[in-house]
């Protein structure tokens, strides 16, 4: 089952989430929206195992990276109808 990984614009470019990910789902890409001039990106979500280590590593008050497990995504989509 595939999980959804969302990166929010509150990312400060610290790379903590990228280093915490055991399956290399995340990488840093150039972005002018923060002081670090980079932001996390999730190009390989199919490799996400749902461990949420990236969430735990995020130092921002509002988590900049969130993992939505496949069953959480399915449940929330059902509420939209």
UniProtKB/Swiss-Prot annotation:
Entry cofactors: [4Fe-4S] cluster
Organism: Arabidopsis thaliana (Mouse-ear cress)
Cofactor note as given: Binds 2 [4Fe-4S] clusters. Cluster 2 is most probably the spectroscopically characterized electron acceptor FA and cluster 1 is most probably FB.
GO annotation (BP), single: photosynthetic electron transport in photosystem I
Keyword set, alphabetical order: 4Fe-4S, Chloroplast, Electron transport, Iron, Iron-sulfur, Membrane, Metal-binding, Oxidoreductase, Photosynthesis, Photosystem I, Plastid, Repeat, Thylakoid, Transport
Protein name from the UniProt record: Photosystem I iron-sulfur center
Keyword set includes Cell membrane: no
Binding positions for [4Fe-4S] cluster 2 per the UniProt entry: 21, 48, 51, 54
Annotated residues for binding of [4Fe-4S] cluster 1: 11, 14, 17, 58
Disulfide bridges in this chain: none
Gene field: psaC
Subunit structure: The eukaryotic PSI reaction center is composed of at least 11 subunits.
EC number from the UniProt entry: 1.97.1.12
Molecular-function GO term, any one: mRNA binding
Entry function: Apoprotein for the two 4Fe-4S centers FA and FB of photosystem I (PSI); essential for photochemical activity. FB is the terminal electron acceptor of PSI, donating electrons to ferredoxin. The C-terminus interacts with PsaA/B/D and helps assemble the protein into the PSI complex. Required for binding of PsaD and PsaE to PSI. PSI is a plastocyanin-ferredoxin oxidoreductase, converting photonic excitation into a charge separation, which transfers an electron from the donor P700 chlorophyll pair to the spectroscopically characterized acceptors A0, A1, FX, FA and FB in turn.
Assigned GO CC terms: chloroplast; chloroplast stromal thylakoid; chloroplast thylakoid; chloroplast thylakoid membrane; photosystem I; plastid
Matching Gene3D superfamilies: 3.30.70.20
Record-annotated 4Fe-4S ferredoxin-type domain positions: 2-31, 39-68
Any Pfam family matching the protein: Fer4_21
Catalytic activity: reduced [plastocyanin] + hnu + oxidized [2Fe-2S]-[ferredoxin] = oxidized [plastocyanin] + reduced [2Fe-2S]-[ferredoxin]
Places the protein is found: Plastid, Chloroplast thylakoid membrane
Membrane topology reported for the UniProt record: Peripheral membrane protein
Main location, first listed in the record: plastid
